[in-house]
């Protein structure tokens, strides 16, 4: 008995199959979308410390209210010493 014959015999399974197919498709498309975003880093060999390339003058949050972004002197000194 094939899958479609089973669905035609038990019609109450059709909505379940449709919802599961849509959910699996949505989850798969979101996973692929997440991999192509620039926030996700998969190649750690080229840039093992990606947080050092973040510009401190650019806010990284969705909402920033009255916040000043300043470089931290101690971190700047550590970066200069390690490079």
Swiss-Prot record:
It comes from the Eukaryota. GO terms for biological process: response to bacterium. Pfam families: B12D (PF06522). It is found in: Nucleus. GO terms for cellular component: mitochondrion; nucleus; respiratory chain complex IV. Transmembrane segments: none annotated. Keywords: Nucleus. Coiled coil: none annotated. Belongs to the complex I NDUFA4 subunit family. This is Normal mucosa of esophagus-specific gene 1 protein.
């Amino acid at each position: 008995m094939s899958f479609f014959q089973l669905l035609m015999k038990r019609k109450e399974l059709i909505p379940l199959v449709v919802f599961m197919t849509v959910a699996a498709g949505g989850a798969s498309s979101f996973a692929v979308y997440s991999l192509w975003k620039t926030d996700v880093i998969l190649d750690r060999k080229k840039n093992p410390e990606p947080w050092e390339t973040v510009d401190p003058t650019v806010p990284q949050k969705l909402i920033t209210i009255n916040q000043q972004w300043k470089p931290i002197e101690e971190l700047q000194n550590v970066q200069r010493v390690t490079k």
